[in-house]
């Protein structure tokens, strides 16, 4: 199955890029998006409605767990719902699924929520935004500038605002 192979490759990539502390490839990382996996039965409105369907299979759940084993932490809410099917009119009945997540490494999440109000708007996506605030201080970057035997020290802290933390975003991986 393509989805399972893709998630396995992603977990291996995350592990490979982790590096050792102090190495250049040991950078903070955020993976976020629609994983189309409900990691637990509590992440769907009625597990009996999903028996023998995608999103809740043991193989999918193991693939999601592989991302955690690769060194990522779920930083987004682990309860509530982030998706409601339009066709079945699930939103007004709060019959949803939690399938959208942010996973991180090397960052401290200071808060998170699912923006259900955004989902309630006319013409909104069937997914609600998953918002996570991170406490992130960018490392000081130093280097020398060539010229006349002088060295210039440069300092950059572009991520002083937690919303500027480096991210990788994922799309729909159904």
Task: List the model feature ranges, each with a label.
Residues 1-8, 48-53:
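Surface-exposed cleft-lining segments at the edges of enzyme active sites
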Residues 160-161:
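N-terminal, intrinsically disordered, basic low-complexity segments enriched in Arg/Pro/Ser/Thr
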Residues 164-165:
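Short hydrophobic alpha-helical segments enriched in small aliphatic residues
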């Amino acid at each position: 199955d393509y989805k399972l192979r893709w998630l396995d490759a992603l977990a291996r990539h995350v592990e490979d890029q982790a590096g050792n502390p102090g190495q250049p490839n040991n950078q903070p990382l955020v993976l976020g998006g629609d994983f189309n996996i409900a990691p637990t039965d509590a992440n769907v409105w009625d597990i009996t409605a999903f028996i023998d369907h995608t999103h809740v299979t043991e193989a999918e759940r193991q693939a999601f767990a592989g991302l955690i084993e690769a060194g990522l932490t779920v930083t987004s809410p682990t309860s509530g719902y982030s998706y409601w099917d339009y066709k079945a009119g699930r939103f007004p009945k709060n019959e949803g699924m939690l399938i959208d997540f942010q996973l991180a490494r090397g960052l401290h999440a200071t808060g998170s929520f699912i923006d259900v109000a955004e989902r309630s708007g006319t013409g909104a996506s069937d997914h609600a935004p998953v918002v996570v605030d991170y406490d992130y201080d960018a490392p000081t970057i130093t280097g020398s500038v060539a010229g006349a035997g002088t060295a210039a020290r440069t300092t950059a802290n572009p991520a002083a605002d937690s919303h500027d933390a480096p991210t990788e975003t994922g799309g729909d991986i159904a």
